[in-house]
């Protein structure tokens, strides 16, 4: 079975590292965070329930 040269392992490691970083960045930036204003409005709307006992 042939052995790989150290530069082959290094290039393989660099390729896998770059693809991992690329997919991680794509996953991070694919979601669009909601603005804080909409979250504050949602909280105020849910907390303003008037219970009539």
Curated annotation (Swiss-Prot):
Membrane-spanning ranges: 6-26
One of the protein's GO biological processes: proton motive force-driven ATP synthesis
One Pfam family matching this protein: ATP-synt_8
UniProt entry tagged with the keyword ATP-binding: no
Entry's Gene Ontology molecular function annotations: proton transmembrane transporter activity
UniProt membrane topology term: Single-pass membrane protein
Keywords, comma-separated and alphabetical: ATP synthesis, CF(0), Hydrogen ion transport, Ion transport, Membrane, Mitochondrion, Transmembrane, Transmembrane helix, Transport
Domain of life: Eukaryota
Alphabetized InterPro entries for the sequence: ATP8_metazoa (IPR001421)
UniProt keyword Amino-acid biosynthesis present: no
Chief localization: mitochondrion
Subcellular location: Mitochondrion membrane
A single Gene Ontology CC term: mitochondrial membrane
Similarity remark: Belongs to the ATPase protein 8 family.
Oligomer and partners: F-type ATPases have 2 components, CF(1) - the catalytic core - and CF(0) - the membrane proton channel.
Function as written in the Swiss-Prot or TrEMBL entry: Mitochondrial membrane ATP synthase (F(1)F(0) ATP synthase or Complex V) produces ATP from ADP in the presence of a proton gradient across the membrane which is generated by electron transport complexes of the respiratory chain. F-type ATPases consist of two structural domains, F(1) - containing the extramembraneous catalytic core and F(0) - containing the membrane proton channel, linked together by a central stalk and a peripheral stalk. During catalysis, ATP synthesis in the catalytic domain of F(1) is coupled via a rotary mechanism of the central stalk subunits to proton translocation.
Protein name: ATP synthase protein 8
Native species: Ceratitis capitata
Gene transcribed to yield this protein: mt:ATPase8
